[in-house]
């Protein structure tokens, strides 16, 4: 907080480095002299005036690259000057903001006659102005939320260009948000087809607008084709229309694929959005009743102009949240908490038809505002669009570099007995969510050291008791034995484990029936591949310390594996097992000591066990004296595509089979334990594969 005798600023410090082009500055006038307004003055920008209530104010401020000298002056001549520095992070992946037009679009959006008279129409240029300012408000709001969650000043960038900036009443040439005007191949009639309107309960294809937007972007070309990384795009359909019963040409959707991450929305509420910053407070407090003969009352929550602005701006931001990787949450923007988005910019709320009240009392404290859920902000922290330069000075951060197209890495879960398990991630786990009825009700986060955490973890031990203790009592009663676990890692797709408690409810296997000592017990790992495919094989046991060679049967998938081992001399006792050595876990680095393939196995005096099928196509791998198998890497999906053997000497074989098939998974017993055998399911080839592990 920057303090002075007369004015305090709560969320802006002297000489602070800012990465958002727009801020919501919270302040208080300590001098009780009846100040009603505060004006923000900037040497390069027009002044903007904001109201003061109960001595508090919220001022939405635009910044220019470099030094920004901001002076806050009340109408009673109380003043405070502060300097901050804005640095656009052009290296971060931006969001492209787009208006999608039908090929025969009249270039107009829905607007009541009164509003058209006030704003001078409802054409394309006005839509661009409104969308540009709305995007700046989303950036400012998100930056404030990240700051409140102790993650620093961070927000996502939009694509910008040097052109006429319309954020103020008087346009000027400077950097501002670029609005792509994208023509669709579809006509107005096709876009407004009731069958593809999302809110039409009888519609036959209510998700079609998402595909129409995707096709329009790809036809537009430029940044939306032939890119190395997925492109992020937030699109509004200009030709959305309220016909008195249905909003046509509108869908609120967010998601995408590895080429385009996409959010779409309709323009049915755009009439209520401000066109410039000077209109921000008047538009957020405009109690004019919506005329449903002219414009839509979306979800019956847009009874006034200001409520329409709040709902539609917030709902579009909700879809951008999906674009940025956020699922629905139990609270906040990703639930439907954006019905109070207006409060983040105001110190006094207007009358709400939706609630039949004047809402929060002045000056509207942060606890009464809409929020990004904590889990959203953690996702943003590990999203490439939110990167800060100083993140790279913290080795524990493991900064993400990809928006999609990840290597298909599967997390490994190893039950340990007693309701506990070990979770492995090759890239580092930063968040574990406990999912009850599709919503996260508890979580464990691994923030970087610079933000007070321990950094993403490649190995985590969790217990059912700890996970259940993180659930609210009502959720625990309903879902304590059935909750899902969702694991998020850096540069990797999310992984969900259904009915997670049952996964840990394992019964140790008595391994004495397989030739081990009486006290040896084994635990089955989860199966990778198709866990309901083929036929169950049971346990194929072997003493890994006696294995000298492996024969892998493979073609375009894994057919089988035969383990050759020395027979233990009669009458000898098991030697005490020493702790197996653990090689480095960087399986993506270049392999310099690979096991020799196609070696001839001398089968004399060797026994063997077979998992799967024996075929004419195989590769042999021979172990060195004292070398044991400590794990396997797999490529798997609907079956097991390929297998790689890892040894205690830090060596790995090639990936035998279809090395480009499926996703990557690893199987290794917990530290101090050994592989006691393998298990899985086999059909025409190996459908699923797992290990048995335990102490020796």
Curated annotation (Swiss-Prot):
CDD domains linked to this entry: Jacalin_metallopeptidase_like
Subcellular location(s) per record: Cytoplasm
Annotated InterPro entries: Jacalin-like_lectin_dom (IPR001229), Jacalin-like_lectin_dom_sf (IPR036404), Jacalin-like_metallopeptidase (IPR033862), Metalloproteinase_M10B (IPR053002), Unchr_Zn-peptidase-like (IPR021917)
Cofactor binding annotation: Binds 1 zinc ion.
Pfam hit, one: Metallopep
GO molecular function, one term: metal ion binding
Residue ranges of domain Jacalin-type lectin in the record: 522-695
Gene3D superfamilies: Jacalin-like lectin domain
Active site residues of this protein: 319
UniProt: Zn(2+) binding residues: 318, 322, 328
Enzyme class: hydrolase
Miscellaneous notes: Present with 195 molecules/cell in log phase SD medium.
Protein name as annotated: Putative zinc metalloproteinase YIL108W
Organism: Saccharomyces cerevisiae (strain ATCC 204508 / S288c) (Baker's yeast)
